[in-house]
C-alpha cells in the first residue's frame, strides 16, 4: 500500500495527537486528523504497544493511554500520575513525564521515566487485556539525582538499559516474569561532560549505542555476556562537525544537544541526531553502517537539518523498511520524510503543522 500514517505529539499545551498521511508513490505528506486530548496533557514522547493498537504518552505530569481504532480514531482511555517521589506530581515542581518504553513480550508492561527534579524512580505499569495502561505496579529506584531520558531492552527482553542524563551513567536492570525489574548495576559515562540521553541496541544483543547529549557523540559499548553490563569500546563518533564552535562565548553554555539514535528495520544502519540551542543555528543528522556483529563499521555522513530542531529533531526510521525515515522539529513545526537509498539520504516529502509545540517524535502506524 502506498499510504502510510504517522502520529505526532507536542511539547506544550494544548494536548493533541496529529495524524499525517504519507504517500510513498506520489511522495506527499498531509495532515488528515487533529485529535483533541486532555489539554494539559501534551505528549512529548509517544510509543505504540506491540500490536499498534494503543498509544502510550509521556504527558507532563501524567502517563496517558489511547486506543487506536484507525489512523483517525484515537480514543483517550487512561491517565496515571507519576510514581516514585511524593513531590513529583506537585504543580510547583518541574518534574515531567519524559519517556516510556512498551514491552513486546508478555506481560506487555510499560516502563516510564520522569525527568528534571524528583525523577529518581522508574515507573512500571501493567496493562489490561486490550492494552490500556492499568496499574502502577512498581516504582524502582535509581538514585536521587537521576534523570533518565531513554531506555532500551535487549532482544530477549531480559535486560533493560537506561540512559541517565543528569547522573551521567548507564544502568542495567533485569526484567522478572512479573514485568517488574531488579538492579544489575551501573557504569559511569566515559567523560564527565557526556550526559547519556538515549540508548539503542543491535538485534544481536552484542552492542549498545549510547547517545551523549552534552558530549554530542555516539559511544559504542559491547555487552559483557557474563554480567550483561555494557563495556565502553573506546570507539565514539561525532554528532556535530568536529571543530565547530560549540560554546556560547557570552554564557559558556553548550550550543548543541544530541537527541535520539535509532536503528533501521534491517539492523544494518543507525541514524542519530543533534539539536542546536539557538534558532539561527542548524541541528545535524548522522548515519552509521553497522557490522553484522553489531559494532559500528563507519560513519557514513553528518549533515545539517533544515532548522535547529528545537526540542525535537527526533529521527524515526520506518519499522518495516530501511527505505523511509521521518524527522520532526518544533522550531517551525515540520514533519519530513527522507528516503534512504544506496547509503544516500534525501528528503522526499514534508508538511508544516503550525500548532503550539508541534512536533515531537513521529511514530509509524501502517
UniProtKB/Swiss-Prot annotation:
GO terms classed as biological process: beta-ketoadipate pathway
Keyword vocabulary terms for this entry: Isomerase
Domain of life: Eukaryota
Catalysed reactions, semicolon-separated: 3-carboxy-2,5-dihydro-5-oxofuran-2-acetate = 3-carboxy-cis,cis-muconate
EC numbers, comma separated: 5.5.1.5
Active site feature: 149, 197, 213, 275
GO molecular function (one): carboxy-cis,cis-muconate cyclase activity
Pathway(s): Aromatic compound metabolism; beta-ketoadipate pathway; 3-carboxy-cis,cis-muconate from 3-carboxy-2,5-dihydro-5-oxofuran-2-acetate: step 1/1
Entry function: Catalyzes a syn cycloisomerization. Also possesses mle activity.
Assembly and binders: Homotetramer.
Family indicated by similarity: Belongs to the cycloisomerase 2 family.
Name used for this protein in its record: Carboxy-cis,cis-muconate cyclase
Amino acid at each position: 500500500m502506498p499510504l502510510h500514517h504517522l502520529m505526532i505529539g507536542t511539547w506544550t499545551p494544548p494536548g493533541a495527537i496529529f495524524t499525517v498521511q504519507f504517500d510513498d508513490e506520489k511522495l506527499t505528506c498531509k495532515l488528515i486528523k487533529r485529535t483533541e486530548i486532555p489539554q494539559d496533557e501534551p505528549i512529548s514522547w509517544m510509543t505504540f504497544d506491540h500490536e499498534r493498537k494503543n498509544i502510550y504518552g509521556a504527558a507532563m505530569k501524567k502517563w496517558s493511554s489511547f486506543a487506536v481504532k484507525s489512523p483517525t480514531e484515537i480514543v483517550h482511555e487512561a491517565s496515571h500520575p507519576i510514581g516514585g517521589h511524593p513531590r513529583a506530581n506537585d504543580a510547583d515542581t518541574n518534574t515531567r513525564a519524559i519517556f516510556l518504553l512498551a514491552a513486546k513480550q508478555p506481560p506487555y508492561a510499560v516502563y516510564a521515566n520522569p525527568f528534571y527534579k524528583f525523577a529518581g524512580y522508574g515507573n512500571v505499569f501493567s496493562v489490561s487485556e486490550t492494552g490500556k495502561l492499568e496499574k502502577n505496579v512498581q516504582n524502582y529506584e535509581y538514585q536521587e539525582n537521576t534523570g533518565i531520558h531513554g531506555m532500551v531492552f535487549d532482544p530477549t527482553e531480559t535486560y533493560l538499559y537506561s540512559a541517565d542524563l543528569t547522573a551521567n551513567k548507564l544502568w542495567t536492570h533485569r526484567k522478572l516474569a512479573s514485568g517488574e525489574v531488579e538492579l544489575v548495576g551501573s557504569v559511569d559515562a566515559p567523560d564527565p561532560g557526556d550526559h547519556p540521553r538515549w540508548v539503542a541496541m543491535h538485534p544481536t544483543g552484542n552492542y549498545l549505542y549510547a547517545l551523549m547529549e552534552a558530549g554530542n557523540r555516539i559511544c559504542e559499548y559491547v555487552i559483557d555476556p557474563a554480567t550483561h553490563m555494557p563495556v565502553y569500546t573506546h570507539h565514539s563518533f561525532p554528532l556535530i562537525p568536529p571543530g565547530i564552535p560549540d560554546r556560547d562565548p557570552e554564557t559558556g553554555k553548550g550550543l548543541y544537544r544530541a537527541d535520539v539514535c535509532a536503528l533501521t528495520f534491517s539492523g544494518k544502519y543507525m541514524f542519530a541526531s543533534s539539536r542546536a540551542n539557538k534558532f539561527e543555528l542548524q541541528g545535524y543528522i548522522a548515519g552509521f553502517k553497522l557490522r553484522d556483529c553489531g559494532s559500528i563499521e563507519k560513519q557514513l555522513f553528518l549533515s545539517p537539518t533544515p532548522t535547529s530542531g528545537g526540542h525535537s529533531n527526533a529521527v524515526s526510521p520506518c519499522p518495516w523498511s530501511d527505505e523511509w525515515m521521518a524527522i520532526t522539529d518544533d522550531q517551525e513545526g515540520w514533519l519530513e520524510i527522507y528516503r534512504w537509498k544506496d547509503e544516500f539520504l534525501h528528503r522526499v516529502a514534508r508538511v508544516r503543522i503550525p500548532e503550539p509545540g508541534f512536533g515531537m517524535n513521529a511514530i509509524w502506524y501502517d
